[in-house]
Structure formats: structure tokens, C-alpha cells
Amino acid sequence: MAGNPKKKSTGIVNAAIGALAVVLAILIVWMMNLVSGIQGTARIINYAGLVRGKTQRIVKLEISGQPQDGMIADIDAFIDGLRFGSDELSLVRLNDDAFQRKMQELDDYFQALKQEISRVHAVGSNNTDIIPISETFFSICDDATGLAEAYSQRKATSLSALEKYI
């Protein structure tokens, strides 16, 4: 006795629908993961820019004899948040080796800049390298911001490609 061909084709269709549903579910989870990764990158780019701009303001004010210990502490917190993530600042940690290496360089250079600011307090700005050090720091900040933008663009491109399949 042969099996009912109608039942057999219905079973194949049901199996195909089930397989497609599983594939779709996997793609949706993948897309949600990409969206989650993109959501925090705008704040990272913004804070990298804040580090750059606020540091230049600190240098200008310090040179004019107005100590900025509070803003220096802010920059330390921003750099720490950019490197490791921060719930307080709502910053995610970018899982990007180039960005993380640049943030380590930025942190190290900010420590040198703070030492030079201390020298400004002691001997005056004309007797220090505060301007060239702050210019190098500005350049490192530009690089870090560019790396964060590139990371964000890669994530957005991946999401766009995935959306085409869904």
C-alpha cells in the first residue's frame, strides 16, 4: 500500500516552512545584535569629539592662569568610559582592536598632557611644551574619532546587507 501523495507533499511543505521560520528567526536575532551594536556608537563618536574639544579648552584656560581640575577629571572619566564602557555616561565598549589601541595611546598621552599642565602651573606656559603636546593630543583624538566612525559605518553596512536578505 503506497503512502498518500497529498500527505507526503504536505509534510514536505510543512518541513520547508519550519526550516524557513528557523532561518528567519536566526537572521532576526543577528539583525537585533547588529542594531544593539550600532546604538552605542553615536555616543562614542560624540564623546571622542568632546575629549578633543574640551581638552583644547582646558589648555587655553590653563595657559591663561585659570586651573581646570574639574574639567581634567571629566576628561579622565570620558577616556575611561571610551576604553571600558560606562553605565554612568551610557557608553558601550567598542569591540574594535584599532580603536582600543588608539584609546590606550590617547590615555597615555593625556597623562603626559596633565604633567605638562602641572609644569605650566610651576613655570608658566612659555617655559613648557604645552602647545605642541596639546596639538599631538588633538591629532590622536582625531584618529580615535575616525576609528569610531569607521567602526560604526562597518556595523551599519552589515545591517544594511542583512536587511536585504530579510
Describe each model-derived feature in a short phrase.
Residues 1-7:
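Short, Lys/Arg-rich, polar N-terminal cytosolic tail immediately upstream
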Residues 7-34, 164-166:
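Extreme N-terminal signal-anchor transmembrane helix of membrane signaling/transducer proteins, especially
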Residues 12-17, 29, 41-44, 48, ...:
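An N-terminus-focused feature that recognizes amino-terminal "leader" regions
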Residues 26-37, 91, 115-121, 153:
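Short, charged/polar, low-complexity loop and linker segments
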Residues 34-76, 128, 159-162:
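Juxtamembrane membrane-water interface segments immediately C-terminal to a transmembrane helix
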Residues 72-136, 140-147:
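Heptad-repeat alpha-helical coiled-coil/4-helix-bundle sensor or tether segments in soluble regions
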Residues 137, 157-166:
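Short, intrinsically disordered, charge-balanced linker/junction segments flanking boundaries
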Residues 143-161:
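Short, aromatic-rich amphipathic segments at membrane interfaces
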